[in-house]
Design a protein with these regions (language model features):
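ATP-binding glycine-rich phosphate-binding loop
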Residues: 7-29
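All-alpha amphipathic helical-bundle segments outside canonical DNA-binding/catalytic cores
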Residues: 127-131, 262-268
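Protein kinase-like catalytic domain
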Residues: 58, 115-119, 237, 255-258, ...
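ATP-binding pocket architecture of kinase catalytic cores
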Residues: 33-125
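Active-site activation/catalytic loop segments of kinase-like enzymes and analogous catalytic loops
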Residues: 226-259, 272
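Active-site acidic catalytic loop and adjacent metal/ATP-binding pocket
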Residues: 27-29, 67, 178-227
């Protein structure tokens, strides 16, 4: 009896010689190079949009992963349990090290290059873009909910005690962020594009060609490119004790490829929101 990845792979016009279990995916040696079989939780139309967007990025000079079609020209294949997968090119490389300022700079430049390309890709006029200030408000509500949960407990541990002491400061930061983001969104000065959606040290690699390359675009969505940059900075800063020199290096590297105006810089305030 076939294993689940083998059932999904037989839907494609290719010969597979070896399958290796990777991080949440299957690395496949095939007659046309290495492929990655990845579980997919979206619908077919979203997968088609992702495939078209990745093709656009590649045509515009960034050799990102491309998604394969099945024998029936579908994007999604299913295994014997009806779980969905997509098959894409495997871009081998070394992940960004959060201990290396050069790596973090390289990842930041790659993100800026990606954003330069994506801003040329037109979004449908009726597409929904997640509101930044509403997201900030939800995070504030979560902080209040957590505080109320701690208050109801008869005993608290050291972490919960520390959280309660810092609660007001974090909540005020979140409220200030939501207020500023609301003003920016109302001014219509932020321009939405497609965003990577999960740009961190695991999703940008240094390839054999000597270039940094974003990978794993499954969470790509319409939004504001500044959110990618802010989340990347947050991840790097968390790993480096919130060293402001790291933030400066990441911003400088990004801006060396893609400039940020005052509005874009101000929108990065949501990095201060509690997570």
């Amino acid at each position: 009896m076939y294993n689940q990845p083998e059932v999904a792979l037989e839907k494609y016009e290719l010969t597979v010689s070896r399958i290796i279990k990777g991080r949440g995916a299957y690395i496949c040696d095939t007659g046309i190079g290495q492929k990655l079989l990845v579980p997919y939780r979206g619908h077919e139309q979203r997968a088609c949009t992702l495939r078209d967007t990745l093709a656009f990025i590649q045509r515009n000079g960034m050799d990102v992963e491309q998604i394969s079609q099945t024998k029936e020209q579908c994007i999604i294949s299913r295994d014997n349990c009806e779980d969905a997968y997509i098959l894409k090119d495997y871009r081998a490389g070394r992940e960004c090290s959060t201990d290396s300022i050069d790596d973090m700079r390289g990842g930041s430049r790659a993100l800026a290059q990606l954003h330069n390309i994506l801003e040329k890709y037109p979004l449908p006029s009726d597409i929904d873009v997640e509101s930044l200030h509403e997201k900030a408000q939800r995070k504030c509500a979560q902080i209040v909910k957590l505080k109320n949960y701690i208050l109801r407990r008869s005993k608290t541990n050291a972490f919960e005690h520390l959280f309660y002491e810092c609660y007001e400061r974090f909540l005020e930061q979140g409220k200030k962020s939501a207020e500023i983001l609301c003003e920016l969104e109302n001014s219509k000065t932020l321009v939405p594009t497609y965003c990577h959606g999960a740009f961190n040290q695991h999703n940008v690699v240094y390839t054999q060609s000597g270039r940094w390359l974003p990978v794993n675009f499954e969470t790509m969505h319409p939004g504001y490119p500044e959110t990618d940059l802010a989340e990347y900075m947050r991840k790097m800063l968390e790993k480096n004790h919130w060293d402001t020199a790291v933030a400066d290096a990441i911003l400088d590297s990004y801006c060396s490829v893609r400039s940020l105006d005052d509005t874009s810089m101000l929108s990065l305030i949501h990095i201060s929101e509690p997570t």
